[in-house]
Amino acid sequence: IGMDRWKETYCMVVALCAYVMIRANHKPPVSVLPRPEMAHMSNVGIGHILLEESVRVRQSYDHRENPTHYSVLTLWFYSGCYFVLARENTAWTYLRDATTQAQLLGMHDEETYKHDPLDISRKRVLYWLLFIAERYSYKPTCSLQRSLLTAYRTYALRKHRPISLHPTIHSPSLDEVPSDRPIAVGLELMINMFRIIDDTFINLWNRVHSTHASAAWITQVQTQLSGAVPAYFECTEVQEVQIRITQQWLRSQAWQLSACQGLVSSVSNDIPLTFKYPIEIARDLLTISHQFSQQAMEVHGVGLVSRFPFFAPSALILEIVFV
């Protein structure tokens, strides 16, 4: 193995360790820490040191000219680390680097996967996670598939930023590993929801063109979002809460888009185009809060309130969810 390839693998593993430490809720054994003084540091402090180490080593070799899936994964972990450290612009920059390198590798082209039979499903997972991240970015955990279980942050929608990846390849298949089945189902549902947030939606949201959305198109989007998640599916409780809250959040974003487009009216025959529609979404959120355990809901914490700013007062949502 070449020195650059060794460094690349090292950077990926250390970046993964950095993110696990930043997110961890328990102290690692002192015996595994690289320096004795780290035993007195916080998890975030240890993770920050590991992150800086990975970034430092990565700067010592040419990682741009010949990218690999390891380099894309490393950038993905960097993005997650810097977001947790409240450096969102740096996190976005690394996410952009990851999507660019993914395109250089042809991960957006279905033909690429026909010539590389090894670990295809995992590479597809990585592409689709990047696809979702641009639209509704989230913090990755040590397992790519399990990153669906964590708290989310928005980029293309909340930050009005452009997207570069599109739904141009088949969805991943993880059926060959029975333990991955619930995760695969959840990922498939997330992919299907974010397919609806297409170029037309993002361009209207970002006001790229002077064109306006039609009432029929908005109604179609709301119909697709409302039917995107079945009444029952196999997954963990926390994952199901995340998926169902994401669905309601996307419905709220579509309603805000229709309001900005001047399509909302108190006399509209289409319920998604009325002022009462946010109340319907709020009721669905209330139902979700009653269906699942407090522990599963608390995973989302204050982020749940920040995702639905037009449901006033915010204290009411906190009362609904946590009381």
Identify the role of each PLM range.
Residues 45-67, 97-110, 173-177, 192-199, ...:
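Long, amphipathic alpha-helical regulatory blocks in the mid-to-C-terminal portion
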Residues 1-72, 77-87, 179-181, 232-241, ...:
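C-terminal transcriptional activation/regulatory domains of eukaryotic transcription factors
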Residues 8, 12, 70, 118-122, ...:
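Structural signature of alpha-solenoid helical repeat junctions
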Residues 85-101:
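Classical protein tyrosine phosphatase
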